[in-house]
């Protein structure tokens, strides 16, 4: 249904337009996107004729500073915090509204010699400032346009236009597919662009290494930062893992209540201890401790989910009632850490098939799933049964 990111990049490099869709739980819309560097009056005319939306120009913060583009409003109350600046026209234009003059304004924005005084305000081009980090920080069309431009090796600026149906309603995926077919345009998703960047870019940095004696044995501890957020992760390494042989690995998501306080609501603490003990017995392995509290929703939201469970909701229903997916974890950062450690073939300590799929999506091969089942307790029987019934965990209860 959708095209590969590589196909879209090739078309963009040729000055063509692509369609980019965002998540159905976000705006659930599609935009025409082109590279600002290659913009022509013909492309602008195509967008306004067949897209019918507002023509905007996503740019980096650097462009906005050079052109002295102030925010459109002092207090942005837009639900998605779209970073509009004041609208502009180049001083050489007349009304600024024609396709030719809009293309002129866009091209002059990219002119290194241009400065703020070269543009009238307000105007008919609407710059948008993309978040640093692109779609990995904000999954919007603004960031997608700048990311695509950078991936093409072009100036980090795009031209976007929302696609509206002839009856005035927003075009959704079925409409967008028809549009893409009609005009022979590549169609991609922001979700796929995020996955592409996670797969092709190095997002983790090895910060510090120490020797860590524990009750289970002595491990080589390696601390990692990442460029997506402020979360810091740690890998506990045992023995020589550089032989190329499959390595026993446990990817453990942080659980303060279970790991530290010994909560009986879950089996996280016992799993952590059992994994460390098993790696120690084998004399070789890795425990990767990921700061993904509460399956990615954070500590306070996990406690809120616990409160809902006390009211009769199960662990999945509680997450969804709070507005989160059942499992918000992403294994891209963890996969990059494992690859930084030189691992390729894993014997994965897990009961979760989704974790296997999540890691294998990043060119890691799970040779064997090693079960890690803990005895159920009265307090967590329902929780564990829900993980089996709704999350597909492989447990014998």
Curated annotation (Swiss-Prot):
EC number: 4.1.99.12, 3.5.4.25
Binding of Mg(2+) 2, residues: 27, 141
Pathway assignment: Cofactor biosynthesis; riboflavin biosynthesis; 2-hydroxy-3-oxobutyl phosphate from D-ribulose 5-phosphate: step 1/1; Cofactor biosynthesis; riboflavin biosynthesis; 5-amino-6-(D-ribitylamino)uracil from GTP: step 1/4
Catalytic activity: D-ribulose 5-phosphate = (2S)-2-hydroxy-3-oxobutyl phosphate + formate + H(+); GTP + 4 H2O = 2,5-diamino-6-hydroxy-4-(5-phosphoribosylamino)-pyrimidine + formate + 2 phosphate + 3 H(+)
Binding residue positions for D-ribulose 5-phosphate: 26-27, 31, 138-142, 162
Binding site for Zn(2+): 255, 266, 268
Keyword S-adenosyl-L-methionine: no
One Pfam family cited in the UniProt record for this chain: DHBP_synthase
Binding site for Mg(2+) 1: 27
Site, Essential for DHBP synthase activity: residue positions: 124, 162
Region annotated DHBP synthase, chain positions: 1-199
Signal peptide (residue range): none
GO BP annotation list: riboflavin biosynthetic process
Region (GTP cyclohydrolase II): 200-397
A cellular component annotation (GO) from this entry: cytosol
Active site residues according to the UniProt entry: 327 (proton acceptor), 329 (nucleophile)
Annotated residues for binding of GTP: 250-254, 271, 293-295, 315, 350, 355
Cofactor mode of binding and number, as noted: Binds 2 divalent metal cations per subunit. Magnesium or manganese.
GO molecular-function terms, A-Z: 3,4-dihydroxy-2-butanone-4-phosphate synthase activity; GTP binding; GTP cyclohydrolase II activity; magnesium ion binding; manganese ion binding; zinc ion binding
Known role: Catalyzes the conversion of D-ribulose 5-phosphate to formate and 3,4-dihydroxy-2-butanone 4-phosphate.
Family: In the N-terminal section; belongs to the DHBP synthase family.
PANTHER family given in the database record: 3,4-DIHYDROXY-2-BUTANONE 4-PHOSPHATE SYNTHASE (PTHR21327:SF18), GTP CYCLOHYDROLASE II-RELATED (PTHR21327)
Name recorded for this polypeptide: Riboflavin biosynthesis protein RibBA
Gene name as annotated: ribBA
């Amino acid at each position: 249904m959708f095209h590969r990111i590589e196909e879209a990049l090739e078309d963009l490099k040729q000055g063509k337009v692509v369609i980019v869709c965002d998540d159905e739980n976000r705006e659930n819309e599609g935009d025409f996107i082109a590279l600002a560097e290659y913009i022509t009056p013909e492309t602008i005319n195509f967008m306004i004729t067949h897209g019918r939306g507002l023509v905007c120009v996503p740019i980096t913060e650097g462009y906005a500073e050079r052109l002295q583009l102030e925010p459109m409003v002092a207090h942005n109350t837009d639900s998605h915090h779209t970073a509009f600046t004041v609208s502009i026209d180049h001083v050489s234009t007349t009304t600024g509204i024609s396709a030719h003059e809009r293309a002129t304004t866009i091209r002059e924005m990219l002119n290194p010699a241009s400065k703020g005084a070269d543009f009238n305000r307000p105007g008919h081009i609407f710059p948008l400032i993309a978040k640093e980090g692109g779609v990995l920080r904000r999954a919007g069309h603004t960031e997608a346009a700048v990311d695509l431009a950078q991936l093409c090796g072009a100036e980090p600026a795009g031209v976007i236009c929302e696609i509206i149906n002839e009856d005035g309603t927003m075009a959704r995926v079925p409409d967008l597919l028809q549009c893409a077919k009609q005009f022979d345009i590549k169609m991609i998703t922001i979700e796929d662009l995020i996955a592409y960047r996670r797969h092709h870019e190095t997002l983790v940095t090895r910060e510090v290494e120490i020797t860590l004696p524990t009750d289970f044995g002595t491990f080589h501890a390696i601390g990692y930062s990442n460029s997506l957020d402020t979360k810091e992760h740690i890998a506990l390494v045992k023995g020589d893992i550089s032989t190329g042989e499959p390595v026993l690995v446990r990817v453990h998501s942080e659980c303060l209540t279970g790991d530290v306080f010994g909560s009986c609501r879950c089996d996280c603490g016992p799993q952590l201890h059992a994994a460390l003990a098993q790696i120690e017995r084998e004399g070789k392995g890795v425990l990767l401790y990921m700061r993904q509290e509460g399956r990615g929703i954070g500590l306070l939201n996990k406690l809120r989910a616990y409160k809902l469970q006390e009211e009769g909701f199960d662990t999945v229903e509680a997450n969804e009632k709070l507005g989160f997916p059942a499992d918000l974890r992403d294994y891209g950062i963890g996969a990059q850490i494992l690859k930084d450690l030189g691992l390729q073939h894993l014997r994965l300590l897990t009961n979760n098939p989704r974790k296997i799929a999540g890691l294998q999506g990043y060119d890691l091969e799970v040779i064997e799933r090693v079960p890690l089942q803990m005895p159920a307790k009265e307090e967590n029987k329902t929780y564990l049964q829900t993980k089996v019934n709704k999350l597909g965990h492989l447990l014998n209860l």
